[in-house]
């Protein structure tokens, strides 16, 4: 049995949707070419989108990719030492 682990990548999609005239998950899904269930899974951190989908999401909101998705800096947890 496969165990689904939450991704370490966080995102601000829900906040961006509400800042964009309360765009629904279904509306976002249609604009980026995925299902509503996929948008839900991405928002909840249960699924990491492909690079193409990530860029489409950023484009929909007119923001840089880094505004939508954040990846924790491992160095901050290891005392600032790069890996």
Residue ranges of predicted features:
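Short alpha-helical DNA-recognition segment
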Residues: 22-41
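Short, charged recognition helix plus adjacent turn
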Residues: 2, 59, 69-83
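Residue-level signal for the short linker/turn that defines the boundary of a DNA-recognition helix
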Residues: 11, 22-23, 49-52
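Alpha-helical residues within the helix-turn-helix
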Residues: 18-19, 30, 59
